[in-house]
Amino acid sequence: MRTRPPPVAPRRRRPLLGLLRLILSSLWLALVVVAPLTAAWVASSLAAHAGASTRLALASALLVFPVVPLLWEAFAAWRRARRPATRRFLTLSDRLVLRTLAVSFVFVGALLARNPQRAFEALNGRGDWMLDGRHDRRAETARRTLFRVAAKSAWLYHLADAPPPRPQPLPEREVARVTPTPSGTGPTPSGDEPAPVLPAPPRDPHAWPWPADGPHAAVLALTPADETSPAAVGRFLAAHEHDQWHLARAVHDYVADRIAYDVVSYRTHRFPPQDAETTFRTRLSVCAGYAALFTAVGRAAGLTVETVVGRARHAVTDGMGEGHAWNAVKLDDRWYLIDTTWDAGGVDAEGFHKRYGTSYFLTPPEVFLSKHYPDEDRWQLLPVARTPGEFLRMPPLRPQFFGYGLRLVSPDRAESDARAFVNVVIDNPRHVWMMVSVRPDGGEETRCEVSRGTSTTARCPLNGRDLHEVVFFASNQRYGSYEGVGSLSVHNR
């Protein structure tokens, strides 16, 4: 008599296991979409940063991913057909996903490894190229998301950063000064005759900018007998100036007045010692020596002083800039920023030219950080520290731009795109006189058509598909010298 086999118990469903499989499958498939899109974003951002065709870069990147993985799969199938049959563990879908991921990683890795610093600047500066001209809520949300992702690429910049000792940047460059023709011929700084230049509002005696009316009286009173060491100078200045704010000014003026920039060392990248004693003795240094001497003299005078290191730039094309050093001084329980190097003078092809200034003395942090970026976030002196990407996107404006009471309205980015011409809008509540010029890379400068008022507007022609530099000049007088106060870059699309 046959016995019946025991009934097979039905398999118990495991909903958690099924949910886990669904989640993993979804993530697996999402990777095959996200990876190629990331590669296309990197490639097109690099193209936008270089002024090349973003459409071509985007199309090329997207074309690679369906084509290369499929060709790879076809080649693998051809090789498999010529061998004895073996069992496959992966489905066709799994193999295509893995091949797509491999191609994506190689493609992105090659783009990043070729020039990590340029890749960082492209993602953080032009990573939102596809949103140019759009400022609606969705566009701004997408822009913030893209730049949050781009900010994660900061390791690329640090990877490419040169190890100490780093080359130091030149002092603030001699900016071209232009003198408009008084006659009615040719371009003029404005159209109709507007109201006269409005005076600046009354200033606090400690408020920035401080008047550049010459070195402090205590500095002028120094004799060779008083100037035997940094400590002796600090004690002398403290004995002749009891106000802490003006004492800081005296220390600043001493360093900016006594030290010349070492152009030869900068250009040969062979730097002698940059300590305070050597700088004091030789009267020659790059920025590290300026900062070290300010620290030594300031501390000897009884001030709380620190040396700050970071990066500084002159123009948009400098990216994050070069290694630089400056100072921070504590007055009335608050920290302030000082750059004696850039207040000492300027450099051109002939060498260093002494030109005393106070633009970088106790400069407001938001103004100072237009061209300086410290290695430590705490020395930004801002409630919320700016990221390297935010620094890159800011136009490099000189302190004089803010000293004239100006505010850049549009374009509000260091680097942007335009077609045939670009309109520049600057808020100008004091009615200062302005000129704007545009120059293509390697080309000749062209004056822009400027209309003047509480809002200055300039229409600048873009000639050729090159990168153009737009430079702003300002003056309190219509006729005479106009000083450069800032610049930005525009790609002609």
Region spans (language model):
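Residue-level preference for alpha-helix termini and adjacent loops
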Residues: 236, 258-260, 279, 337, ...
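Secondary-structure boundary elements
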Residues: 185-286, 295
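Secretory-pathway-linked proteins and extracytosolic
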Residues: 111, 119, 138-220
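Short, surface-exposed, charged/polar-biased interaction segments
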Residues: 269-276, 319, 348, 382
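Hydrophobic/aromatic-rich core segments of domains that either
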Residues: 289-368
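Mixed-charge, low-complexity segments
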Residues: 2-162, 168, 236-237, 348, ...
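Short linear motifs at secondary-structure transitions and domain/linker junctions
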Residues: 263-265, 299-305, 356, 398-401, ...
